[in-house]
Design a protein with these regions (language model features):
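A structural signal for multi-pass alpha-helical bundles of membrane permease subunits
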Residues: 2-206
Length: 206
């Protein structure tokens, strides 16, 4: 019974995707036909897409921006998560609570403030401004990675420090390799979130 439910769920999820894919190969006047498989296969939509638009350039610009934002977020997230997990400093508790509280408010609430700041610096309609805005939203990822680092044995850190390693060396040579799976997940989350962002992108890139 469990497998039946799984297969039914898979079919329900994949059917719209299959419909869109098959519709893309239909002639221009047969998109809304009730049949799943078009009566006449055509690649005219793809021909029009690649020959009449700058689709590849648009895609490359989006991917490039997403890679840059994801890399910046990963660097900031990993450093912050290590600091909150392994170091004890003044304001640590309040910093963690602030990150948690920030998750309550949608990022759209800060758009007006961001725009005023970007406008004052004369960076409106620039990739630098968009990267600055999108790379900052990593509070959830910091909590996610901190929880993962908390589960790593502290004895490894202590053994390395006994041998003379600094905190940064412990972070780079021990924590990062052990946290590689979680780092990959965070990079993927950041990439997808940036690629899916429309409102902020449309505001800062006019």
């Amino acid at each position: 019974m469990g497998r039946v439910v799984i297969w039914v769920t898979i079919i329900i999820v994949l059917f719209p995707v299959l419909w869109i894919v098959m519709s893309s190969f239909s002639a221009g006047d047969s998109f809304f036909l009730s049949s799943l498989f078009p009566k006449k296969f055509s690649i005219e939509h793809y021909t029009s897409l690649f020959q009449e638009t700058n689709f590849m350039l648009w895609t490359w610009n989006s991917v490039k921006l997403c890679l840059i934002v994801a890399a910046i977020q990963l660097a900031m997230t990993s450093l912050a998560a290590y600091a909150f997990s392994r170091l004890r400093f003044t304001g640590r508790k309040y910093g963690l609570m602030s990150l948690l509280v920030l998750q309550v408010f949608p990022s759209s609430m800060a758009v007006a403030g961001y725009y005023i700041l970007i406008y004052e610096f004369g960076l409106v309609d620039s990739n630098a401004a968009l990267i600055f805005v999108l790379a900052g939203g990593s509070a959830y990822n910091i909590w996610l990675l901190k929880s993962y680092i908390d589960g790593l044995p502290k004895e490894l850190d202590e053994a390395a420090m006994v041998d003379g390693a600094t905190h940064f060396q412990v972070f780079r040579k021990i924590i990062l390799p052990l946290a590689a799976p979680q780092l990959a997940v965070i990079f993927l989350f950041s990439f997808i979130a940036t690629y899916s962002e429309y409102v902020i992108t449309s505001i800062f890139l006019q």
